[in-house]
Regions:
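Divalent metal-coordination and catalytic microenvironments
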Residues: 8, 28, 48, 63, ...
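Hydrophobic/aromatic beta-strand patches that form the interior of the parallel beta-sheet core
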Residues: 4, 44, 78, 105, ...
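A short helix->loop->beta-strand "cap" motif at the edges of active sites that frequently abuts
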Residues: 72-77, 166
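Binuclear metal-dependent phosphoesterase catalytic core
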Residues: 112-124, 129, 222-287
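Accessory, non-catalytic peripheral segments of nucleic-acid enzymes
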Residues: 37, 42, 247-380
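His/Asp/Glu-rich metal-coordinating catalytic cores
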Residues: 55, 84-218
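N-terminal active-site segment of His-dependent metallophosphoesterases
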Residues: 1-68, 72, 362-372, 376, ...
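Glycine-rich phosphate-binding loop signature in dinucleotide/nucleotide-binding domains
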Residues: 35-39, 119-120, 162-165, 284-286
Length: 380
């Protein structure tokens, strides 16, 4: 049996306030063309079907169209909700959808029940596990020692051990320790939401969603397929692809990928304003791509964003890299150490460790902790 592994469609997503819906429709049409050329026996959709828990109507219509196209091709679909999705909304109508062989994970209420498939090699069981938080698992099994995300997943898998005589697939949406992240993902401070890859040892293949870079974790058969489109400039150098998984006898799994070509690439460009507006430099190039332009001019160019968009209409982000900006970024610790706040110290450390700034929510949480620590010190 052969399957297509997809995840993190993020339908309805906006990047730098640009709607990605047309690009998403384009890439889904390309995926359908791939399926027409390369027949499969089913499709895994490993979460984050939408970008928000309450998606825009256009995104709902796009997912409806895509699932209908898969059903018309008589392809079973195995879908779960991710951390960006509303599990309740994703699960709506799931009992009816099963009549069209579209299997959607219900709202988490206990160990998933395997969906059996058969071929000449025997039975293949598919387990659908939506995005988990420890509180969800404690609610179902209050007597189990569940404190962390790793505890939560371990608890669930203890209650649904795969049949060792069958081939087994787990479709899940978690952050596995050791995987590489991108700016467009939500990852908790210190990796507290990570789970250990050893929890998946009993499964022949683990179809993961959540991380946007295509990658294996620990072994080839524990895999993130990545997003079908680039959703941040940290992904600019990535090559997106569709992941195909083929199962033979028990333990025999082969993985191949097919490249995906977006309607508009997402690229980073740098140079002086004069260079970037010289027709000889941009004629014949993909000026409609989504761009992050870094100007190297020492003096700011008046109204540069609007003027550049005359040539590059999908310019998403504009920065400068010059003597002034480099000096602004420079931190001279001995001179500033006593003048910056504890939160600023921690923010700089977090940025250095994670290559991304604290979110507003994380900063507020840290500030609250700092104030509590200071108060305890004063009261001591």
């Amino acid at each position: 049996m052969r399957f297509l592994h997809l995840s993190d469609l993020h339908l309805g997503k906006r990047v730098c306030e640009f709607s990605m819906l047309d690009d998403q429709r384009f890439i889904l049409e390309q995926i359908l063309s791939l399926l027409d050329e390369t027949p499969v026996d089913g499709v895994f959709l490993a979460g984050d079907l939408y970008d928000k828990p309450v998606p825009p109507a256009e995104a709902v219509r796009l997912l409806d169209w895509f699932l209908t196209q898969l059903a018309e091709r008589q392809l079973p679909v195995f879908a779960i909700s991710g951390n960006h999705d509303s599990a309740d909304r994703i699960a709506f109508g799931s009992a009816l959808l099963q009549n069209s062989r579209v299997y959607v994970s219900p709202v988490f209420s206990g160990a998933p029940v395997p969906i059996p498939l058969t071929d000449e090699y025997g039975t293949l069981d598919v387990y659908l596990l939506p995005f988990l938080k420890p509180a969800m698992v404690r609610h179902v099994w209050p007597d189990e020692p569940v404190e962390s995300y790793n505890d939560a997943l371990a608890c669930v898998l203890r209650h649904c051990p795969p049949d060792p005589a069958h081939r087994s697939v787990l479709v899940a949406h978690q952050f596995v320790a050791g995987a590489a992240c991108c700016e467009s993902e939500e990852v908790s401070v210190g990796g507290v939401d990570s789970v250990d890859t050893s929890l998946f040892d009993a499964f022949d293949y683990v179809a993961l969603g959540h991380l946007h870079s295509p990658q294996k974790v620990s072994r080839d058969a524990v895999r993130y397929c990545g997003t079908p489109l680039k959703y941040s400039f940290s992904e600019a150098d990535q090559h997106k692809s569709a992941t195909f998984v083929e199962f033979g006898l028990k333990g025999e799994v082969s993985i191949t990928t097919a490249p995906l070509t977006p309607k508009h690439d997402l690229r980073e460009v740098r140079g002086s304003y004069m260079e970037l507006t010289d027709r000889r430099n941009y004629d014949g190039t993909a000026v409609d791509d989504y761009l992050h332009i870094t100007l190297t001019d020492e003096q700011d160019v008046p109204d540069a964003l609007a003027r550049l968009r005359v040539i590059y209409p999908n310019l998403m982000r504009l920065d400068y890299d010059n003597l002034r900006t480099r000096e602004d970024q420079e931190i001279t610790a001995p001179e500033r150490a006593e003048s910056i706040t504890p939160l600023e110290h921690f923010s700089a450390f977090y940025q250095l460790q994670n290559n991304q700034p604290l979110t507003a929510e994380q900063a507020a949480f840290c500030q609250q902790l700092i104030e509590e620590i200071w108060k305890e010190g004063e009261d001591a």
